[in-house]
Amino acid sequence: DRSPAMVQLERYLDFSRRVEEAGVEIPLHHCSNSAGIIRMPEANLNIVRAGITIYGIYPSSEVERDIVKLEPVMELKSHVTYVKDVPAGAAISYGGTYVADRKLRVATVPVGYADGYSRQLSNKGWVLIHGQKAPILGRVCMDQFMVDVTEIGDVKKGDEVTLIGRDGDEFIGIEEIGDLCGRFSYEFACDISPRVPRVYIKNGKEI
């Protein structure tokens, strides 16, 4: 229902007219956030505030996807630092919240909540390795977490890990991570900490 937003727009435009009639020039008029840019072009005026759409992410499920085609541009990548076999009955990570029900092959990923990777993904998130899903085992720690690579062949130290983005035919989006955590997907775009290096790619090359 756009009617509340339309009321706000009319009030803004009316106020702007009154101010200008009083002799005050307003060079820039701004109302639209990401959702407004897509759903209310009449509110875009002469400057807009594109936030989450810059990442190629729709602002909410209420925004029609056929108006503007967005493609996610942000990825979060890491690598495997350690791989080992653990026996059935072994507790994994702090607090022993996950106990292996069989022999498992476990890989360590050097990313944690200090990097902005949510602790709420403990025991329910997953990453991509070799284009396959690897479930998170136990708690996400400050600087690392563990994943099950038992069914993924030949995982070794140094292999790429995709936390957000695409690997082969599989994809992990920020929206999906938000759903897993019961949190707003925007948070993950904002939470990635300064200690995580930013790499910008243009035409397939780092810039």
Stretches found by the model and what they are:
Residues 83-207:
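C-terminal accessory subdomain/extension
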Residues 1-79, 83-87, 153:
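Active-site loop/helix belt of alpha/beta enzymes
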